[in-house]
Amino acid sequence: MTITITDRAFERIYELIELEKDKNLVLRVSVDSGGCSGLMYNYELVSKDNIEKDDYVFTRHNATIIIDSISQKFMLNCTLDFIEELGSSYFNVSNPQAKAKCGCGNSFSV
């Protein structure tokens, strides 16, 4: 699977895990139906015990990201980054497969 995950994204995941004080956590990124355009990215800290055999697993900077097999096809050639702007911070997926985004930027279609 080809996906780029920036150092900033891994560093932020590590910070979130440190805040939870549970080294057994990983970030699950998934694509689910929802939003104005039909598909949305979801981010959830879950236990390493929840890693499935067909999950794609990325580990760097003492942080792990997992993507389920269904979501993988929607995330091919994507870049996952963590953005800090004036007054807000968020994970951002740049997806070359996205044909449209909703006005608020929270959902997309392929």
From Swiss-Prot:
Transmembrane segments: none annotated. It holds the Pfam family Fe-S_biosyn. GO terms for biological process: iron-sulfur cluster assembly. PANTHER family: IRON-SULFUR CLUSTER ASSEMBLY 2 HOMOLOG, MITOCHONDRIAL. Gene3D superfamilies: HesB-like domain. Belongs to the HesB/IscA family. This is Uncharacterized protein RP063. One of its GO terms (molecular function) is iron ion binding. It comes from Rickettsia prowazekii (strain Madrid E).
